[in-house]
Amino acid sequence: MFFRSEAEQAFNVDAIESPIMDTVIKKSAAVYSGEPPWKDVKNGIRTINFAKSLSSETARLATLAIKITIEGSARAEWLQQQTDAVFFSIRKWVEYGCAYGTVVIKPNGKTLDVFTPDEVLITDYDNQNITGMIFKDTYTQGKWYYTRLEYHRFAEEKQGEETVRPYYISNRAYRSKTPDSIGDPVALKDTKWSELMADSPPILKANGESLDGPMFGVFVTPQANNVDKSTPLGLPVYAEALEELKDLDIAYSRMTGEIHDSERIVLADDRLLSPAGTPVNKMTPGAAATTHLPKYVRNVYGDGTDTFYQEINPTLNTEVRVNGLNALLSQIGYKAGFSNGYFVFDQKTGMVTATQVESDDRRTIQYIKDVRDQLEKCMDAVYYALSVYADLYGESPAGEYEVTYDFGDITYNREEDRARWWGYVQAGKVPAWMYFVKFEGFSEEDAKAMVEEATPKEDELFDSKYKEE
């Protein structure tokens, strides 16, 4: 990371190095952005960027119908407002975490910032929990590139006979003419970060105790890091399947290349291509040049007594190649945490019941639950950091809060649910208006009015009976 030396010098600290993970991070960024090392346009090897699809699908399922509710006090209401402001970004944040293995979410006093591993330096961690970190933030103004380094850490200090661990935040700004260097130091007041302090005072709880954790949250993928077991960073969800992703790109490129080269070709003697009605003695070489030919016809100048004609119809091996693609997709999906056959190329599976889905995709369900657990852990830390900010800057009154996470069922089948609820209505277990609200889009008021209008009145029943008598 090009800002490592400047950061270490500015804050007089040694960042925890992991050359192996630095390589993984760089490769992950390239693969996720659609520029894997095996891409070779010259030799026809393209990429379908399935690493992006894996990360996106994992994030989609993990955040399916997510709902975060915070209750308990005025502080809870303020935290709910902060959540609602970034709610639709949560899925993207999870995707970045799946793609890079780690993503860090940090309050900035106004909203939440998100950092990938190539934008941070770890300075301290305890039992795989990161407690010290340097963040890199940038912006461009005119021809200048501005960079801010923000250092978060705990520090042990003596207060009389007691040892306390206050939390500190330090900021340093830089300016450069190129994006590949942070350049020279510049005063914070000369940047858009002018309201920030270079060094914060000690941050402690109101009772003088140390904070319960750092002022940021870290999302890591659930699988163990077998590349560097000592680092708290996670691995991309596709880390175990890089070789298969390479094979998939090669196989797909070969298949599409075969399709591109499969155009029907007709080789025909120029004497066969003369305009209709031309006398035989006038069928001279080059006469076909004045005739508009279909694009698949190639003119062959014959010099023999017989005219030449041949059709070339290449045979496609699509079915065989698709089977190979499906085998690779299944292996990639399994290594990423999904059930066998979750990813299939060009295949219709038809309708299945929720019970079948739960049985077939049990591995997927467990994997997504693990990802959701990591997301909850990260967001809990973020809410704690936000609450500390609220205390420091008086954003809201202090108070207890309780966070509830609700996720959608990935085995949910709407048609089955609809039939089940209609059965409840017919059995008299629930009122009909609830069914119309849940499945037909009615408002509660309109649904109740419609049901009431359709319900025969008791007086009308008696009147009808008397009229018949």
Predicted features along the sequence, with ranges:
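Activation/maturation switch segments at domain boundaries
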Residues: 422-469
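Extended, regular secondary-structure scaffolds
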Residues: 104-235
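Extended hydrophobic-aromatic, low-complexity segments
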Residues: 17, 341-345, 415, 432-435, ...
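C-terminal amphipathic alpha-helical
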Residues: 86-100, 105, 255-263, 269, ...
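Generic structural marker for isolated residues within well-ordered, non-membrane alpha-helices
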Residues: 76, 329, 383, 432-433
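Extended, charged amphipathic alpha-helical segments
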Residues: 196-356, 410
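Charged, long alpha-helical assembly modules
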Residues: 312, 316, 324, 331, ...
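Extended, helix-rich architectural segments
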Residues: 1-144, 466-469
